[in-house]
Amino acid sequence: MLDKWIIDYMADQKVIVPDNVVVVGQSAGGWAAIALSSRNLPSVRAIITFAAGRGGHVGGKPNNNCAPDKLVEATGEFGRTARVPMLWIYTENDTFFGPALSRKMHEAYTGTGGSAEYHVLPPFGSDGHFLIDSADAIPLWAPLVSQFLDKRQ
């Protein structure tokens, strides 16, 4: 079992519809999900990310990504082969991957062939990067997720 991808493992579970997997990731997990999209796994129907990226808060400083140009470049590389529909959700006050950076990432991804809906929600809390951690945020992102998934049924 250890040699199987987690997606394959989960798809084998009786509670999972094996050819209808939706991957969800936040922050670095969202970045991993963007990378995963480039693999086009047959069981993955869609991918949803919240505040996806890597390299934020260098030296503990907000809005200080260690290599934003490389992040954008890598996002474009993933988009070249990705054909899985994606939903990307960010907030205006994300101090790890603010709108300017996340927009460039999205443009790079879709500009090379990737398919991703991009949404920037209004500011949430003191740092919108943690939107997904709060039950109070569900009414903000749940309609986007529902609409996205409804289109894929």
What are these regions (language model features)?
Residues 1-14:
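Alpha/beta-hydrolase active-site loop
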Residues 14, 40, 109:
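Active-site catalytic pocket residues across diverse enzymes, especially alpha/beta-hydrolases
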Residues 15-27:
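Alpha/beta-hydrolase fold nucleophile elbow
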Residues 25-35:
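Glycine-rich nucleophile elbow surrounding the catalytic serine of serine-hydrolase chemistry
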Residues 35, 100-104, 136:
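Generic recognition of short, well-ordered alpha-helical segments
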Residues 36-45:
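Conserved hydrolase catalytic core segment
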Residues 46, 52, 57-112, 117:
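The feature captures the conserved acid-bearing segment of alpha/beta-hydrolase catalytic domains
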Residues 112-153:
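C-terminal catalytic histidine-bearing segment of alpha/beta-hydrolase fold enzymes
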